[in-house]
Amino acid sequence: MELAVVSVLGADRVGIVAGISSVLAKHNVNIVDISQTVVQNIFSMVMIVDISKADVDISQLRRELEEEGKRLGVMVAVYHIDVFKYMQRI
Protein backbone atom coordinates (compact mmCIF):
# COMPACT_ATOMS: atom_id res chain seq x y z
CA MET A 1 0.00 0.00 0.00
CA GLU A 2 1.19 3.51 -0.84
CA LEU A 3 -0.73 6.08 1.17
CA ALA A 4 -1.52 9.74 0.68
CA VAL A 5 -3.53 12.26 2.69
CA VAL A 6 -6.25 14.33 1.01
CA SER A 7 -7.46 17.34 3.00
CA VAL A 8 -10.51 19.41 2.02
CA LEU A 9 -11.68 22.64 3.67
CA GLY A 10 -14.30 25.21 2.76
CA ALA A 11 -17.89 26.35 3.00
CA ASP A 12 -20.30 23.42 3.26
CA ARG A 13 -22.37 22.62 0.20
CA VAL A 14 -23.93 19.68 -1.57
CA GLY A 15 -21.59 17.49 -3.61
CA ILE A 16 -18.18 17.99 -1.99
CA VAL A 17 -17.66 14.36 -0.97
CA ALA A 18 -19.11 13.15 -4.28
CA GLY A 19 -16.89 15.45 -6.36
CA ILE A 20 -13.65 14.57 -4.58
CA SER A 21 -14.51 10.86 -4.47
CA SER A 22 -15.30 10.80 -8.19
CA VAL A 23 -11.80 12.07 -9.06
CA LEU A 24 -10.28 9.39 -6.82
CA ALA A 25 -12.44 6.62 -8.30
CA LYS A 26 -11.66 7.76 -11.86
CA HIS A 27 -7.97 7.08 -11.17
CA ASN A 28 -8.43 3.80 -9.24
CA VAL A 29 -7.52 5.39 -5.88
CA ASN A 30 -9.03 3.59 -2.88
CA ILE A 31 -10.28 5.48 0.19
CA VAL A 32 -8.78 3.66 3.19
CA ASP A 33 -10.11 5.98 5.91
CA ILE A 34 -12.21 9.12 5.96
CA SER A 35 -13.25 11.69 8.53
CA GLN A 36 -15.46 14.66 7.81
CA THR A 37 -17.25 17.24 9.88
CA VAL A 38 -19.12 20.49 9.52
CA VAL A 39 -18.67 23.22 12.14
CA GLN A 40 -20.69 26.42 11.71
CA ASN A 41 -21.09 25.75 7.98
CA ILE A 42 -17.35 25.07 7.49
CA PHE A 43 -16.75 21.67 5.89
CA SER A 44 -13.59 19.76 6.78
CA MET A 45 -12.58 16.34 5.48
CA VAL A 46 -9.44 14.25 5.72
CA MET A 47 -9.02 11.08 3.68
CA ILE A 48 -6.28 8.49 3.79
CA VAL A 49 -6.10 7.02 0.30
CA ASP A 50 -4.16 4.17 -1.30
CA ILE A 51 -2.48 5.40 -4.49
CA SER A 52 -0.54 2.20 -5.23
CA LYS A 53 -2.88 1.19 -8.08
CA ALA A 54 -3.56 4.71 -9.36
CA ASP A 55 -3.23 5.29 -13.10
CA VAL A 56 -1.63 8.73 -12.50
CA ASP A 57 1.21 9.91 -10.27
CA ILE A 58 0.58 11.92 -7.11
CA SER A 59 1.37 15.23 -8.85
CA GLN A 60 -1.29 14.69 -11.50
CA LEU A 61 -3.77 13.48 -8.88
CA ARG A 62 -3.07 16.62 -6.83
CA ARG A 63 -3.68 18.86 -9.85
CA GLU A 64 -6.99 17.20 -10.67
CA LEU A 65 -8.18 17.28 -7.06
CA GLU A 66 -7.21 20.95 -6.74
CA GLU A 67 -9.13 21.71 -9.94
CA GLU A 68 -12.18 19.86 -8.61
CA GLY A 69 -11.80 21.80 -5.36
CA LYS A 70 -11.89 25.08 -7.29
CA ARG A 71 -15.05 23.95 -9.05
CA LEU A 72 -16.60 23.10 -5.67
CA GLY A 73 -15.33 26.24 -3.94
CA VAL A 74 -13.12 24.40 -1.43
CA MET A 75 -9.38 24.10 -0.80
CA VAL A 76 -7.82 20.71 -1.45
CA ALA A 77 -4.34 19.60 -0.38
CA VAL A 78 -2.70 16.26 -1.21
CA TYR A 79 0.40 14.96 0.56
CA HIS A 80 2.24 11.66 0.48
CA ILE A 81 1.93 10.01 3.92
CA ASP A 82 5.73 10.10 4.29
CA VAL A 83 5.56 13.89 4.78
CA PHE A 84 3.74 13.32 8.06
CA LYS A 85 6.06 10.53 9.15
CA TYR A 86 9.09 12.78 8.64
CA MET A 87 7.41 15.70 10.43
CA GLN A 88 7.05 13.54 13.55
CA ARG A 89 10.81 12.92 13.59
CA ILE A 90 11.68 16.62 13.74
From Swiss-Prot:
UniProt xrefs under Gene3D superfamilies: 3.30.70.260
Family matches, as PANTHER family: UPF0237 PROTEIN MJ1558
Positions of the ACT domain: 5-74
One GO term describing the cellular component: cytosol
CDD domains linked to this entry: ACT_1ZPV
InterPro entries: ACT-like_dom_sf, ACT_dom, UPF0237/GcvR_regulator, UPF0237_ACT
Listed GO biological process terms: DNA-templated transcription
One family name in Pfam for this protein: ACT_6
Record's protein name: UPF0237 protein PAE3582
